[in-house]
Amino acid sequence: MGHTSSIACAHRLRSGLITEKEFTAVAAEADWPDAYRINQYVRFEGDDEDAIDALSGFQRFPAWMWRNADVLDFVGWLRNYNEHRHSHRVGFYGLDLYSLHASIRAVLDFLDKVDPDAARRARYRYACFDNYGEDTQAYGYATSFGLNKSCENEVISQWMEMRRRAADLARRDGRDSRDAFFFAEQNARLVKNAEEYYPSMFHERVSSWNLRDTHMAETLDALVHHLGPTAKVIVWAHNSHLGDARATEMGQRGELNLGQLVRQRYGKDATLVGFTTHSGTVTAASGWDSPC
């Protein structure tokens, strides 16, 4: 996130793109279900009473990356901006894949409401992870070294079922069903990709990095498609994700990144903007592992 002055500059850029250039969404280097809670708050669709509550979903380290005063200010600003816009309200979404278990719960919550039989099938498939509790690294280690069977077939089957039944499931939850299904479907995609990601962490770094940024690019593509032809998305992430890896040592190591994939996909419709400094030091957090 960087120093407060850098964040303040970034806030001015984001708010200017929204108010002056009519950007329609912010997609952040944040976990999908946690960011979607903010999306519901700023679009007047959720149950949270204030921005502090909306940010409370961010529990995973480093929670302070998103649960801080600067993000709080931006979330409050975005809600105020949307207040008198009864249509085309600007949304807030997450691109990252570290929320495997939260995403499983989100899929099950959606299916419980629209199709209990499908929910039972999903619970049976996702029970493959039960032996590991919430410890995704234990799952990655055990499956990476062949100590236990992976859940690959189960998560792919669940995602494919939701894709296959998209039209049916999206019609079952009333007028907001399209957004509700999209949220659930992206959580199922996240579970599928995270299942592959965690074992890769115990092998070469290039593999896990590429899986993560490819997931971000897939999620961004899905979001753009969901928002429609007028979508204009601000992507909020670290320089290492947003630059074009082909122009750096990353590319020489065989790494790709979100900026590269977006530029390859959207060409001149994508503009990559990064922050750098000439000299000095930056404090990213006042307390690295202190509670928010």
What are these regions (language model features)?
Residues 1-292:
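Structured catalytic-domain cores with a bias toward divalent-metal coordination
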